[in-house]
């Protein structure tokens, strides 16, 4: 239960970042969804202008869709300027990081009895330490110098969320901030299907002064999603073995 609540909040913050900047840039968002993109739509929560807010069958992850078509056809995002597209893509991860900072301030004030100025500084320091630590773990993993021990899948995160919840509200909120920061940094990695991957592809377009085709985007994203599904399965297997060992 704690895992579902924490993960939903973190994903909502991330997708809202994309959503609000897209709206500001005049890019239409046709769906705002909580759940894995390719899982069936089970519920329409409400509608606002052209946006349908939905819940998918697999409630892990989330996305905003800039296309009217289920298969991700041409959308308004491709018509936006390079700058606006970069801002939209980076808004999700940055929202996670800002959210973590804002959440940690009351944790330090109410949970650890610090003064406001002390809490702000402690929050900023914590954000920096977690961000830099996450970057090191990710870099070491992809460079071959790290191990699986630094990674956690849904099962591992659920276990830690449960442990945090058992220690009280402030521990759970602190864990939420850490998860939010980790999600933000992970999404900035320049790999397919991640926000960082989209930004990297935009840089390629800017250098070659020619847009990549929609089919190229779809193929790259499909490959990226497949890779991350495989990684998720492997990490989840590791978490389960660790749990029952």
What are these regions (language model features)?
Residues 34, 63, 93-95, 134, ...:
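Long, contiguous hydrophobic alpha-helical segments, chiefly transmembrane helices and signal peptides
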Residues 75-90, 105-183, 203-223, 234, ...:
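Functional transmembrane alpha-helices
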Residues 146-151, 188-194:
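Short helix-coil transition sites and intra-membrane helix breaks within transmembrane domains
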């Amino acid at each position: 239960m704690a895992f579902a609540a924490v993960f939903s909040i973190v994903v909502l913050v991330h997708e809202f970042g994309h959503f609000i900047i897209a709206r500001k840039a005049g890019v239409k968002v046709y769906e705002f969804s909580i759940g894995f993109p390719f899982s069936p739509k089970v519920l329409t929560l409400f509608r606002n202008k052209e946006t349908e807010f939905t819940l998918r069958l697999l409630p892990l992850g989330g996305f905003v869709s800039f296309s009217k078509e289920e298969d991700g056809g041409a959308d308004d995002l491709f018509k936006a300027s390079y700058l606006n597209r970069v801002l939209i893509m980076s808004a999700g991860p940055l929202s996670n990081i800002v959210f973590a900072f804002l959440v940690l301030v009351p944790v330090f004030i109410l949970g650890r009895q610090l003064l406001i100025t002390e809490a702000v500084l402690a929050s900023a320091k914590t954000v920096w330490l977690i961000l830099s630590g996450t970057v090191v773990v990710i870099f070491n993993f992809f460079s071959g110098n790290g191990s699986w021990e630094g990674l956690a899948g849904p099962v591992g995160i659920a276990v830690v969320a449960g442990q945090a919840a058992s220690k009280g509200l402030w521990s759970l909120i602190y864990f939420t901030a850490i998860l939010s920061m980790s999600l933000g940094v992970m999404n900035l990695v320049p790999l397919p299907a991640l926000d960082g991957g989209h930004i990297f592809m935009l840089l390629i377009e800017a250098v070659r002064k020619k847009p990549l085709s929609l089919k190229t985007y779809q193929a790259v994203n499909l490959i990226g999603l497949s890779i991350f599904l495989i990684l998720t399965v492997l990490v989840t297997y590791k978490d389960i073995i660790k749990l029952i060992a």
